[in-house]
């Protein structure tokens, strides 16, 4: 995160040394730990460090063995020694990101005990700060969609800033995307995002107001974190590079000196493979179903893109046309040890490409060809499958999905 540009001292800066500044730094710290923990969780799923394990005739889903994980951290140069690895994992335990499977040990120990990420068993505490953070992360992912052009280089008071959004346009977008039902509600959401340090005015001079003022996200959600950063007690902003899309730096007017504004090179950018299963990568079977989780490795993920199951392209407008031959259905799907068991594909709207016949989605009644209308109450008719998948993967284990099904499909 960035504390703000050098372009003047705003009202937020005046409290930097007081309780407001301390609270802001704590929110930034919490957000960094959440992102770091989530990136580690996904890597461990991908490399099968997290898996179902048995002990005394009982199966513990989605677990890792503390001793094995410490070996892995050292092998992958995420920790220099075992003592450091223990300290790193204790940081995640202290933040409620991991825990002993039976909650019998508060301390992370270098022994053969089972631990689990709380996000993998539905016990992750969603307090107001975490909810605001997850909402902000999801909004950013939607804004990064190729179909969205809201984030643009713009000038304010003679200074050029990258990846900005205009307040009034952002409010329009929030209502249009179903993130808020009214403009007032959208503005209240922006105030919450600002209060939690997720967005800010480009030069940190103004609160959020419905105007032509420019704002940015404070945090680079996509930057690959090193686990060792958890031991760095300084402000996370010192770890952001100038190539971060969230850096609030003044931009040169000389286009020859401008940067590409990418957090990482395209080949190393975080990939999201939208199979909506939390198990490790596997090849695509003849049925078109495959299981995977988002991969954070530098090498491209194995992507399986079977031919669309749809008979013909369908638009969101067509689905919502009065009298259209589509029926609405709502499913409550509780993820099992490896996920939810379906594949989403397409854009505006997304559709169900494949369903694991033995998975939770099939048991709830999900079928191929259905169009995804909403996820946990949020309208997703106008986003692509990557955004839908990220919404599901970063949400609770129990998901409520509304779909529309063609009557003769």
Curated annotation (Swiss-Prot):
Motif DDEX motif, residue range(s) on this chain: 217-235
GO function terms (MF aspect): phosphatidic acid binding; protein kinase inhibitor activity; protein serine/threonine kinase inhibitor activity
Location (main, coarse): membrane
Residue positions of motif BetaTrCP degron motif: 286-291
Pfam families to which the protein is assigned, alphabetical: DEP
Region spans: Disordered: 1-23
Domain PDZ, first and last residues per copy: 330-407
Gene Ontology biological-process entries: intracellular signal transduction; negative regulation of cell size; negative regulation of TORC1 signaling; negative regulation of TORC2 signaling; positive regulation of autophagy; regulation of extrinsic apoptotic signaling pathway
Chain positions found as Phosphothreonine: 241, 259, 295
Activity control mechanisms: Inhibited upon phosphatidic acid-binding: phosphatidic acid produced upon mitogenic stimulation promotes DEPTOR dissociatiom from the mTORC1 and mTORC2 complexes, leading to their activation. Specifically binds unsaturated phosphatidic acid, such as 16:0-18:1, 18:0-18:1 and di-18:1. Inhibited when nutrients are present via a feedback loop: phosphorylation by MTOR promotes DEPTOR ubiquitination and degradation.
A GO-annotated cellular component: lysosomal membrane
PTM statement from Swiss-Prot or TrEMBL: Phosphorylation weakens interaction with MTOR within mTORC1 and mTORC2. Phosphorylated at Ser-286, Ser-287 and Ser-291 in response to mitogenic stimulation by MTOR: DEPTOR is either directly phosphorylated by MTOR or indirectly via proteins kinases that are activated by MTOR, such as CK1/CSNK1A1. Phosphorylation at Ser-286, Ser-287 and Ser-291 promotes ubiquitination by the SCF(BTRC) complex, followed by degradation. Phosphorylation at Ser-235 by MAPK3/ERK1 promotes deubiquitination by USP7, enhancing its stability. Ubiquitinated; leading to proteasomal degradation. Ubiquitination by the SCF(BTRC) and SCF(FBXW11) complexes following phosphorylation at Ser-286, Ser-287 and Ser-291 by MTOR, leads to its degradation by the proteasome. Deubiquitinated by OTUB1 in response to amino acid via a non-canonical mechanism, leading to DEPTOR stability. Deubiquitinated by USP7 following phosphorylation at Ser-235, promoting its stability.
Positions with biased composition (Gly residues): 1-10
The protein's role, per its UniProt record: Negative regulator of the mTORC1 and mTORC2 complexes: inhibits the protein kinase activity of MTOR, thereby inactivating both complexes. DEPTOR inhibits mTORC1 and mTORC2 to induce autophagy. In contrast to AKT1S1/PRAS40, only partially inhibits mTORC1 activity.
Subunit text: Associated component of the mechanistic target of rapamycin complex 1 (mTORC1) which contains MTOR, MLST8 and RPTOR. Associated component of the mechanistic target of rapamycin complex 2 (mTORC2) which contains MTOR, MLST8, PROTOR1, RICTOR, MAPKAP1 and DEPTOR. Interacts (via PDZ domain) with MTOR; interacts with MTOR within both mTORC1 and mTORC2. Interacts (via PDZ domain) with MINAR1 (via N-terminus). Interacts with SIK3.
Record's protein name: DEP domain-containing mTOR-interacting protein
Protein encoded by which gene: Deptor
